[in-house]
Amino acid sequence: MLERIKDSFTESIQTKIDAAEALPDSIAKAAEMMVACLLGGNKILACGNGGSAGDAQHFSAELLNRYEVERPPLPAIALTTDSSTLTAIANDYSYDEVFSKQILALGQPGDILLAISTSGNSSNVIKAMEAALSRDMTIVALTGKDGGAMAGLLGASDVEIRVPSNVTARIQEVHLLVIHCLCDNIDRTLFPQDENA
């Protein structure tokens, strides 16, 4: 039992080391896109399933409230939180459309979709991406493994942040770190702090 616990920490550390080599450029590009989106008066919509739904809500909460610095709230919506909407769409249409229908209603050109899936193959997230593209939104995709079908939907103006792992738990751990990196970059770009203060 103790060895298994230690192995989980070791795997997590190694995955983060690998991600630190592979992901900074795509994280920086995604943060720049998000800053431009927010400066343009647009918003960021986020979606995912299970733990990825929690990540979508975490990201939205950090923007709407604050990350590490005092600042005005920033517009972000987690598409995972309204149980009446989610169950109505799932019941009347299908679970595959629970995010896409919200995007068709709320998404505007210039908005960003933060699409989160450890496998890259979640069908409702893929439909969300298709809806976002139809609304002239750009996409930041957080994936893992081989990127799945989500990777094939991305265009030149989109960005994929693919965690170099095949283990769902390790991918989720890095997704949270990526979200914190995005929030930190957004805050420090929009609201520069005096590092010596």
Swiss-Prot record:
Could you tell me what this protein is called?
A: Phosphoheptose isomerase
Q: What does this protein do?
A: Catalyzes the isomerization of sedoheptulose 7-phosphate in D-glycero-D-manno-heptose 7-phosphate.
> Which gene produces this protein?
gmhA
Q: What Pfam families does this protein's entry cite?
A: SIS_2
Any one GO molecular function term:
D-sedoheptulose 7-phosphate isomerase activity
Record's catalysed reaction(s) = 2 D-sedoheptulose 7-phosphate = D-glycero-alpha-D-manno-heptose 7-phosphate + D-glycero-beta-D-manno-heptose 7-phosphate
The record's annotation in NCBIfam families points to: PRK13936.1
Give residues annotated as binding Zn(2+): 58, 62, 172, 180
The organism's place on the tree of life at top rank: Bacteria
Localization annotation:
Cytoplasm
Q: Which cofactor does it need?
A: Zn(2+)
**What is the species listed in this Swiss-Prot or TrEMBL entry?**
Shewanella amazonensis (strain ATCC BAA-1098 / SB2B)
* Similarity comment: family membership: Belongs to the SIS family. GmhA subfamily.
